[in-house]
Amino acid sequence: VKVRVYSFWIAFRGAWRNIPAHMKRIIPFLAFLLMAAGVLAADTRCYELRIYSANEGKLEALNVRFRDHTCKLFEKHGLTNVGYWVPVDKTDSRLIYVISSPNRAAHAKSWKAFLNDPDWKKAYANSIKDGRLVGKIDSTFLNATDYSPTVKPVIPKDIRMFELRTVTTAPDRLKNLHARFRDHTCEIFENQGMTNVAYWTPMDEKKGKSNTLIYIISHMSKKQSGDRLEITKWNLDQA
């Protein structure tokens, strides 16, 4: 949205003096309409939530591999690094992250290119010389809901706690849950000092397309329930 509006103003900046007065009065209004249209546009990107369960003692090495190699290679092949987290509970050796791409077909193409990249193959081989880093991988493809904030990488000004929450509804009740979040819950979260980060539903039925809401909120306090996560420090530096 910002790029579209910025380009609009750059196009007119050089010739501003030659624009009729009545046009000058409506240009800001047109710019507002462009911004409004962008805000209302649906987020059609493909998101992938990936959860890696690291083998015993291997989480730090896994973080190093992502920090030094994987994140850069993702971007090289068209995959956007959205966020990386580790659980607050230090006995939980999972790395949880979200990547995105324009659509699922593009996502699959980018992932294949990433796996076939010689730099990735070299980094992977070097990282497992003392044993494999990951014991289990869980992947869920996601669509953003119509009430989700714009999902984008950010550099938090303060250390925050994050909650990854999954809600499973009774049959045919997901639309009611969406209505409650859209009309009430998201606003109440913000009023209570929580930040709405992202809201998604799975793309695939086997992952809960018809009855599952997955969302992330953040807090300034650790005194919250749920699956609490810390954003990885190396992601703060690179986001």
Regions found by a protein language model. Name each.
Residues 40-238:
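Short S/T/G/P-rich N-terminal loop/turn motif that feeds into the first structured element of a domain
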